[in-house]
């Protein structure tokens, strides 16, 4: 988590999926949503950076990156990805 915070300087990081719900299996990975400021440079808006900074951690992780405005604009839509993450996930980091 520290590596992601240093690399992205995110506003929020959420854990979502089976690990957040508590119904993970032996092959489950960590699913993370990284919410970056709208002003974040292009390289900090891509998941590729996450895989670079997490390389070597030996923890299976999927990372989705989005901007604050994209995330917040969809919160009111019950079936949207951000709404589901807020409802079922866990907030791990808030700046």
Predicted regions: what they are:
Residues 1-12, 20-26, 36-95:
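Catalytic core of pol beta-like nucleotidyltransferases
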